[in-house]
Swiss-Prot record:
Ranges in a coiled coil: none
Summary of the function given for this chain in its UniProt record: Catalyzes the transfer of the phosphoribosyl group of 5-phosphorylribose-1-pyrophosphate (PRPP) to anthranilate to yield N-(5'-phosphoribosyl)-anthranilate (PRA).
GO biological process, one term: L-tryptophan biosynthetic process
Naturally occurring in which organism (per UniProt): Bacteroides fragilis (strain ATCC 25285 / DSM 2151 / CCUG 4856 / JCM 11019 / LMG 10263 / NCTC 9343 / Onslow / VPI 2553 / EN-2)
Binding site for Mg(2+) 1: 91, 224
Reaction(s) catalysed (UniProt annotation): N-(5-phospho-beta-D-ribosyl)anthranilate + diphosphate = 5-phospho-alpha-D-ribose 1-diphosphate + anthranilate
Gene it is expressed from: trpD
Note accompanying the cofactor annotation: Binds 2 magnesium ions per monomer.
Gene3D superfamilies recorded: Nucleoside phosphorylase/phosphoribosyltransferase catalytic domain, Transferase, Pyrimidine Nucleoside Phosphorylase, Chain C
NCBIfam families recorded: trpD (TIGR01245)
Keyword list, A-Z: Amino-acid biosynthesis, Aromatic amino acid biosynthesis, Glycosyltransferase, Magnesium, Metal-binding, Transferase, Tryptophan biosynthesis
Cofactor(s) needed: Mg(2+)
Protein name (record): Anthranilate phosphoribosyltransferase
Length: 331
């Protein structure tokens, strides 16, 4: 590791194979915490390259616990985190909204590293027991139209660095990697990122894959569609900026999306959205993220129709019933 760190400190970049080997060594415990923290710090000081990102991703996908749910052609809705906004669990709520609308979802998530509550915190608050058994995940898809993959069960490197990430409490290149390494390799993905350079990096990376995707970024820094500002949506060969008003939504204030101070707070907000008792801002931000996910699956549908499908799922109680069945089956 010493030679690697010297190379990076001299402002050199890693090759794809080199990055792949380094992450494999991290997963195998070949470096101590101080060395790993030093490596992470390098990528806080400069942008990661495409070759480095792809190499790290290669390692995680090679080491993953494979899960074949391809027959469901599922979507994942996931953000990098690390935007410093501490929102409630918008993408998780959007996943259940999309599943309630009849589209298969495989959510890949983790505990919060830079926020109060990640998707796994909310699932755990509901008594969900995480599993890496394909038969149980397939049953969840068949019965509920959604399965949940707790990242550390499927990616040993993510588990190995979890304590370091939590101790640092700032975004790291592992935030960038999380959305890229869903072990199912879903057919569709809606990916949220915390800045425009990463939006371009993700778009470039996904153009080489078979996954149909959209990458979203709110221009005021959110790693999801926040409705607090204009937002950009990038797909293969296309980028477009939307305003909340152009889609029929009022702008939100940042305070209206806050996730609270504890996982319990975040779960109460999540439940209020599912129950239909949340604020208009909280419901709308879930609806718009779910709508753009549906648009990834059905690009021929106008976005207005996708918004209507997402709204109907949430407001009719279909999303709530999906969550209820999911918790009963997986608790």
């Amino acid at each position: 590791m010493k030679q690697i760190l010297y190379k990076l400190f001299e402002h050199q970049y890693l090759g794809r194979d080199e990055a792949r080997t380094i992450l494999q060594n991290i997963a195998q415990g070949k470096y101590n915490d101080a060395q790993v923290a030093s490596l992470i710090t390098v990528f806080l000081m400069r942008n990661i390259s495409v070759e480095e990102l792809c190499g790290f991703r290669d390692a995680l996908l090679e080491m993953r616990v494979p899960v074949d749910l391809s027959e469901f052609a599922p979507i994942d809705i996931v953000g990098t985190g690390g935007d410093g906004k501490n929102t409630f669990n918008i993408s998780t709520a959007a996943c259940f909204t999309v599943a309630g609308a009849g589209f298969p979802v495989v959510k890949h998530g983790n505990y919060g590293a830079t926020s109060v509550s990640g998707a796994s915190n909310v699932m755990e608050q509901h008594g969900v027991k995480f599993t890496d058994h394909t038969d149980r995940l397939r049953r969840s898809m068949e019965k509920c139209n959604i399965a949940y993959l707790h990242a550390p069960l499927f990616n040993p490197a993510l588990k190995a660095v979890a304590p370091i990430r939590k101790a640092l409490a700032v975004r790291t290149f592992f935030n960038m990697l999380g959305p890229l390494v869903n072990p199912v390799i879903p057919t569709y993905q809606l990916l949220g990122v915390y800045n425009l350079p990463l939006l371009r990096l993700y778009t470039y990376t996904y153009q080489e894959s078979a996954t149909r995707f959209a990458v979203v970024h709110s221009l005021d820094g959110y790693d999801e569609i926040s409705l607090t500002d204009e937002f950009k949506v990038a797909t293969c060969g296309n980028e477009k900026i939307y305003t909340p008003e152009s889609l029929g939504f009022n702008r939100c204030r940042e305070s209206e999306l806050d996730g609270g101070n504890t996982p319990e707070d975040a779960t109460r907000i999540f439940d209020a959205v599912m129950e239909g008792t949340a604020t208009e801002a909280q419901k709308n931000v879930v609806i718009v993220n779910a709508a753009f996910a549906i648009r990834v699956i059905c690009p021929e549908k106008p976005i207005e129709e996708c918004i209507a499908l997402a709204r109907e799922s949430l407001e009719s109680g279909k999303a709530r019933e999906t969550l209820k069945k999911f918790v009963e089956l997986n608790g």
